[in-house]
């Protein structure tokens, strides 16, 4: 495999498990060192990245809290000296019918799914600007284009992710920084397996996808590595649907 990210430093939120961990390990294979921000420990991700010969930092961090993100940013810079790639992957996705949705639940979903990306960008974009190079990848969702019930709060955050991607790309293009988003389908992870979403595992791929199998985190890693590399240096402001052909636009 190529080393397109040789000696880059990638920050990944929610990198302890699932999609974030898969992207972290792929970036390490591509030659990057990794900094993970997550609320839970990441011993398996750490071990895998170290076994690939790369440096890794994992920090307990509530990515929705400005103080936590500021402290995390300082620790990353003191450890590695810079951040080249930022992957805003952390998110929550509880199914809640609109009639039952409280304002507190709405706010929490936005804080974790949207505010975190803003806070992380504020922490690391200044350094990217100084270096004249940077990559920001935001994880969104194909649910933005679909009819999905009990997801008003979540889909609203995913629309915000796409808008943030497009707008921030306009601000940062002159600084050598690209900003793109990846929109997966329903992905099998330990978290989704333990949630109400698991009821759709056997239904959704056959009903809506051209490739009729359930998506796994590994399916997203190639797209992420591409967007993080110089191969995608003239691509910005885009949302790439990596979803087995569910959405076509």
Curated annotation (Swiss-Prot):
Record-listed substrate binding positions: 141
Keywords from the named record: NAD, Nucleotide-binding, Oxidoreductase
GO molecular function ontology, one term from the record: nucleotide binding
Practical applications: The reverse reaction is of biotechnological interest for the specific production of chiral alcohols from ketones.
Biological source species: Aromatoleum aromaticum (strain DSM 19018 / LMG 30748 / EbN1)
Family annotation (Pfam families): adh_short_C2
Domain of life: Bacteria
Residues binding NAD(+), per UniProt: 17-19, 38, 61-63, 89, 93, 158, 184-187, 191
Enzyme Commission number(s) from the entry: 1.1.1.311
Family matches, as InterPro entries: NAD(P)-bd_dom_sf, SDR, SDR_fam
Summary of subunit composition and partner proteins: Homotetramer.
UniProt catalytic activity: (S)-1-phenylethanol + NAD(+) = acetophenone + NADH + H(+)
Protein name: (S)-1-Phenylethanol dehydrogenase
GO biological process: anaerobic ethylbenzene catabolic process; protein homotetramerization
Function: Catalyzes the NAD-dependent stereospecific oxidation of (S)-1-phenylethanol to acetophenone in the degradation of ethylbenzene.
Active site: 154
Family (UniProt): Belongs to the short-chain dehydrogenases/reductases (SDR) family.
């Amino acid at each position: 495999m190529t080393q397109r990210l040789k000696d880059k430093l990638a920050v990944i939120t929610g990198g302890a498990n699932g999609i974030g961990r898969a992207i972290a390990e792929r970036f390490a294979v591509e030659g990057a060192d990794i900094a993970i921000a997550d609320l839970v420990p990441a011993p398996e991700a750490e071990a895998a990245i170290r076994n690939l010969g790369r440096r890794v930092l994992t920090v307990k961090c509530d990515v929705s809290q400005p103080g936590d993100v500021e402290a995390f940013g300082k620790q990353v810079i003191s450890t590695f000296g810079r951040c080249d790639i930022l992957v805003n992957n952390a998110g929550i996705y509880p199914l809640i019918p609109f009639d039952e949705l409280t304002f507190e639940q709405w706010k929490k979903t936005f804080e974790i799914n949207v505010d975190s990306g803003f806070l992380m960008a504020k922490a690391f974009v200044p350094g990217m600007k100084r270096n004249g190079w940077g990559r920001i990848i935001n994880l969104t969702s194909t649910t933005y284009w679909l009819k999905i019930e009990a997801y008003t709060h979540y889909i609203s955050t995913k629309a915000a992710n796409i808008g943030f991607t497009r707008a921030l790309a306009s601000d940062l293009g002159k600084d050598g920084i690209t900003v793109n988003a990846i929109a997966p389908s329903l992905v099998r992870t330990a978290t989704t397996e333990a949630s109400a979403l698991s009821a759709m595992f056997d239904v959704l791929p056959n009903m809506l996808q051209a490739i009729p199998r359930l998506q796994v985190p590994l399916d997203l890693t190639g797209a992420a590595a591409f967007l993080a590399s110089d191969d995608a240096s003239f691509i910005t402001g885009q949302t790439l649907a990596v979803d087995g052909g569910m959405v076509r636009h």
